[in-house]
Amino acid sequence: MTAHTIDGLALSRQLRSALAQRAAALTARGHQPGLAVILVGEDPASAIYVRNKIRACQDNGLRSVLEKYTANLSQAALLERIAALNADPGVHGILVQMPLPKHIDPHRVTEAIASTKDVDGYSVLSAGALLAGLDGFRPCTPYGCMKLIESTGQAIAGRHAVIVGRSQTVGKPMALLLLQANATVTLCHSATPDLGYHTRQADIVVAAVGRARMLTAEMVKPGAIVIDVGINRQADGKLCGDVDFDRVKQVAGWITPVPGGVGPMTITMLLVNTMQATERSAANP
C-alpha cells in the first residue's frame, strides 16, 4: 500500500481562490483587507517566509504593508510601530516575524498587538479563546494542519491522534483543535518514553519537533494520516520533514510532503485570519 499524498499546494490554491473573491467583495465596499508584516534583522529564512506572505497577499487581493528594520532596532521602537499599526484602520492584521533579536522580548511584542489584529493567533487572549472553545484567531500552522486532515475525507471524531511536539505555536494548539473535533489526543514530547509505542496506536500523527526523519515507518500504524510539520535543511541544501517520507508512505494511508504540504497552508490560514479580521471590522466600523 502506498499512501495518498495530501497536496498542500493544491488545497491552498482552492482556498485562496475563494479568499480572493471575498477580498474583492470587501474591497468593492471600501474595506480592502490589509496585512502589516514587520521583519527585524537579516535572518535569511525569515526573509523568505516574509516574501512568501507578501506575495500571497498581492496575488489574492489583500493590501500588504512590509516594514523592515535592522537587528539593532530597540524594543521600545518596535512597540511604538505596533501601536501605530494598531491605530491604523487600513490594517486589519499585524504579524511580527519570529524569531526576533535576543534583546527583544517576543512575549511583550505579541501582547502589544491589538487582539482584533492578532492574525497569527499567538497572544494569551487568542490562546485562552482556543482553550475555552470560543471564537478567535487560530494559530496558522495547526489551523492549516486541520484543513489538511479534513481534506482526506476521513472522520476525526473518535479517532486517536498523537502529536509529537508540545510547542506553544504548534503542538499545544494542535491538541486543542483536535479535541474540539472530538478526537482522542495524546501529546508526546522529549521526555516521552518509547515514542513509537504511542505513534503506532495513532489514526492521526502530527510530527512537529524539528528533527529530520525522526518518525520512521516502524512507528506508524497502517493506514494512518501523517501530517509533517517539520522543516529541516539537509547537508545538500534540500529540505526534509520530521517524517521519513519515502518509507512512511509505504505504510500510511495519507501523508503530507515537505515541501508542499503544511507550509503553503500556514500562509493560506494567515490570509483566512486576515479576511476574518477585515469582515469583523467592516461589520463594526
UniProtKB/Swiss-Prot annotation:
Superkingdom of the organism of origin: Bacteria
Presence of the UniProt keyword Transmembrane helix in the record: no
Isomerase among keywords: no
Entry coiled-coil feature ranges: none
CDD domains recorded: NAD_bind_m-THF_DH_Cyclohyd
Keywords: Amino-acid biosynthesis, Histidine biosynthesis, Hydrolase, Methionine biosynthesis, Multifunctional enzyme, NADP, One-carbon metabolism, Oxidoreductase, Purine biosynthesis
GO MF term list: methenyltetrahydrofolate cyclohydrolase activity; methylenetetrahydrofolate dehydrogenase (NADP+) activity
Catalytic activity: (6R)-5,10-methylene-5,6,7,8-tetrahydrofolate + NADP(+) = (6R)-5,10-methenyltetrahydrofolate + NADPH; (6R)-5,10-methenyltetrahydrofolate + H2O = (6R)-10-formyltetrahydrofolate + H(+)
Binding residues for NADP(+): 165-167, 190, 231
E.C. number(s) listed in UniProt: 1.5.1.5, 3.5.4.9
This protein's GO CC annotations: cytosol
HAMAP family according to UniProt: THF_DHG_CYH (MF_01576)
Assigned protein family: Belongs to the tetrahydrofolate dehydrogenase/cyclohydrolase family.
Subunit and partners: Homodimer.
Name this polypeptide is given: Bifunctional protein FolD
Gene, per the UniProt record: folD
